[in-house]
């Protein structure tokens, strides 16, 4: 019997590149999604920083009244923002080469589109990269599923909402005060506080914070003692150790007696699934709510829904909220609303004093 040994030919440059891209031995995993993620996020970050510092005022409402958003034009960290592209641009794709000059591109808010489009592509690829690394390591894919919640929220406010409203000028400004302005105007125009999907999102975020604090404090309070009183309890854990670092039975017994037995998980896996799923599902619903309100399927309207025997309105908190909404609405984009028909909040003029008789 003869055995022939043949030396394997050296890998091509492309094969070496592919091996490096998909290698899990790199300090930071790149992956094929990373090939697109890295340049897009770098572009979005670079443009955002430059625009936040030095961009000239933007004609956001399309009425030749520019709004300054950068630091060099008088803003601070809190009031500054990358101002959304002009209402005169609407939903048109507005890259630099579509403008007659760089000055025109800046005046019409071109940097906003550049930032959000590259940012969205980047976070989509980041989510895909999470799946890709999980796949390479033989892990389950739930990390990218959890990250899909903030991705959905960002997509809703930066892409879906402007599409529904017909202009990228309605997108969320890229700044602290701009975010608050977006929230207030959103409430005025869509009554988001009265939308059940927003309520589910609030329950998801606040509930997730509560459950996280409860879980962390329970675990910290039931650690297995491995150190003396003079040492930090953190030294009692060695990375990769096989034994449990806390007593789940003690934690279960404590919480079961504090509330009631079945309020406490006795399965660590189902507990951590719950901790992950609760806020994710809540944020999914909020993103879905914003996406439906983008097309003006708004929150509940209970205005003037309670009348006395004489037909007079008995105000509820819904009516108080409506008055706040009207105040928000009348104060935003003041010069763009020449005929604010949506603020016709005066006394109603009766068009028929009594219903006509129908003989049938």
Swiss-Prot record:
Q: Which UniProt keywords apply?
A: Calcium, Chlorophyll, Chromophore, Electron transport, Herbicide resistance, Iron, Magnesium, Manganese, Membrane, Metal-binding, Oxidoreductase, Photosynthesis, Photosystem II, Thylakoid, Transmembrane, Transmembrane helix, Transport
Residues holding pheophytin a: 126
On the tree of life, the source organism's domain of life is Bacteria
What the entry lists under CDD domains is as follows: Photosystem-II_D1 (cd09289)
Keyword S-adenosyl-L-methionine set for record: no
Q: Which GO terms describe its cellular component?
A: photosystem II; plasma membrane-derived thylakoid membrane
Q: Which residues form the propeptide?
A: 345-360
Site, Cleavage: residue positions = 344-345
Instruction: Name the site position(s) for Stabilizes free radical intermediate.
Output: 190
Instruction: Give the record's membrane topology.
Output: Multi-pass membrane protein
- Gene Ontology process terms (BP): photosynthetic electron transport in photosystem II; response to herbicide
Q: Where are the transmembrane segments?
A: 29-46, 118-133, 142-156, 197-218, 274-288
Residues that bind chlorophyll a PD1, according to the entry?
198
Q: Which positions does UniProt annotate for [CaMn4O5] cluster binding?
A: 170, 189, 332-333, 342, 344
Self-association or partners: how does it assemble? PSII is composed of 1 copy each of membrane proteins PsbA, PsbB, PsbC, PsbD, PsbE, PsbF, PsbH, PsbI, PsbJ, PsbK, PsbL, PsbM, PsbT, PsbX, PsbY, PsbZ, Psb30/Ycf12, peripheral proteins PsbO, CyanoQ (PsbQ), PsbU, PsbV and a large number of cofactors. It forms dimeric complexes.
State the function annotated in the UniProt record. Answer: Photosystem II (PSII) is a light-driven water:plastoquinone oxidoreductase that uses light energy to abstract electrons from H(2)O, generating O(2) and a proton gradient subsequently used for ATP formation. It consists of a core antenna complex that captures photons, and an electron transfer chain that converts photonic excitation into a charge separation. The D1/D2 (PsbA/PsbD) reaction center heterodimer binds P680, the primary electron donor of PSII as well as several subsequent electron acceptors.
Q: Which NCBIfam families match?
A: psbA
What is the name of the protein in this document?
Photosystem II protein D1 2
Supply the source organism for this entry: Picosynechococcus sp. (strain ATCC 27264 / PCC 7002 / PR-6) (Agmenellum quadruplicatum)
Gene from which this protein is expressed? psbA2
